[in-house]
Amino acid sequence: MAANNQGEIRYLTPLSVDTKKKKYCRFKKSGIRYIDYKDPEFLKKFLNEQGKILPRRITGTSLKFQRRVAQAVKRARHLALLPYVTDMMK
């Protein structure tokens, strides 16, 4: 019987898993309605080092504003305000 439970670990009390703090939509919190595609410094907050748009699960943005951010980033890229691809953008 001891051989069957050799790889299994049991705890008497459940482990406390620290949950990350609640993500929030910064646009809803601060009341921003329009995302300006002509402001590349603000849009860089939603891009990673390679210039890719960060997903909602990382930024905490709501679906409505994530779509608007994506559209603004695409417009800024088209006008050459933001690069399509880059190395070490930040």
Curated annotation (Swiss-Prot):
Keywords: Ribonucleoprotein, Ribosomal protein, RNA-binding, rRNA-binding. Transmembrane segments: none annotated. One of its GO terms (biological process) is translation. The keyword Manganese does not apply. InterPro entries: Ribosomal_bS18 (IPR001648), Ribosomal_bS18_CS (IPR018275), Ribosomal_bS18_sf (IPR036870). The keyword Ribonucleoprotein applies. Gene3D superfamilies: Ribosomal protein S18. GO terms for cellular component: cytosolic small ribosomal subunit. Signal peptide: none annotated. GO terms for molecular function: small ribosomal subunit rRNA binding; structural constituent of ribosome. Part of the 30S ribosomal subunit. Forms a tight heterodimer with protein bS6. Binds as a heterodimer with protein bS6 to the central domain of the 16S rRNA, where it helps stabilize the platform of the 30S subunit. Belongs to the bacterial ribosomal protein bS18 family. This is Small ribosomal subunit protein bS18. It comes from Porphyromonas gingivalis (strain ATCC BAA-308 / W83). The gene is rpsR.
